[in-house]
Amino acid sequence: MMMMNLLRRSAIAIGRQSKSKLASFSSATQPCSGIPKSSKRVFSNSFLSKDSTGANGLLFRFRNPQASICTEARPKNINSSYFTRSFASRTSKEPGNQQNKAKKEVTTVEDPFDSPTYHIPEKPVTFTEGASYSLVILAGLGVAGAAGYGVFKELIFQPKEYKVFDKALKRIQDDGQVRVRIGSPIKGYGQETRNRAARQRIPNRVFTDEDGVEHVEVNFYIRGPQGAGKVYTEMFKDKAEKEWKYTYLIVEILTPSPAKLMLESYLPA
């Protein structure tokens, strides 16, 4: 009895194991197993059945001479590529749009320091400031006028002492007695110094006598190739003839041999 029971139990266990193996094999070899029912497509040699479209996958299974095909409809690649290209185009356009916006911002922003300042606030000028500016301008004009008058007087209206000096020097240069003693040419100058301005300044004295006659007295130095001397002269302006005439003209030879020469002397008529 015990032997029979053991044989039954072993047979039952073997049967259960075989059933489980068959079930697993059938499930593994079953067409379209593991694929959602809503996405299966089954094709046979006699008819075509369409359940629905679904996710990815394609599976073939041959159970008998009559083959059945289980497929799974996949979305068209056009849609996925379209979405990919559209996304790429959007991402590629975004940097360009950002650059264009940045350029627009750069062009529209203005530097406040470059903008023209047409309205500069001006400080009102008071009466005192205006008067002081006017005085400064008038003083400058006065100085410029005085300088211009001095230059004009020196160039156009020669002073009286220089007229007497030029006339006396011309008379001495033409005199033979002086040329024999100091040589020729003879030059005249105001003072014995190397200062050019001092040499050009002629010592003089201007006065009017009791008759109302104007007199000019000058003295200057002369020098020639062989010697030098000093000149004393005085001239007056004749009212009748309106000319300058000598009162006297004396030349004192200093070198090489001292001598005094009276070249001109006025003798009233």
From Swiss-Prot:
GO terms for biological process: protein import into mitochondrial matrix; seedling development. GO terms for cellular component: cytosol; mitochondrion; TIM23 mitochondrial import inner membrane translocase complex. Expressed in leaves, sheath, flowers and buds. Lower expression in roots and stems. Residues 88-100 have a biased composition (Polar residues). It comes from the Eukaryota. Keywords: Membrane, Mitochondrion, Mitochondrion inner membrane, Transit peptide, Transmembrane, Transmembrane helix. Residues 88-115 are annotated as: Disordered. It is a single-pass membrane protein. Disruption phenotype: Strong lethality at the post-seedling stage. The chain crosses the membrane at residues 130-152. Part of the respiratory complex III. Interacts with TIM23-2 and the cytochrome c1 and c2 subunits of complex III. Belongs to the TIM21 family. Its main location: mitochondrion. It is found in: Mitochondrion inner membrane. Residues 1-70 form a transit peptide. InterPro entries: Tim21 (IPR013261), Tim21_IMS_sf (IPR038552). This is Probable mitochondrial import inner membrane translocase subunit TIM21. Signal peptide: none annotated. May participate in the translocation of transit peptide-containing proteins across the mitochondrial inner membrane.
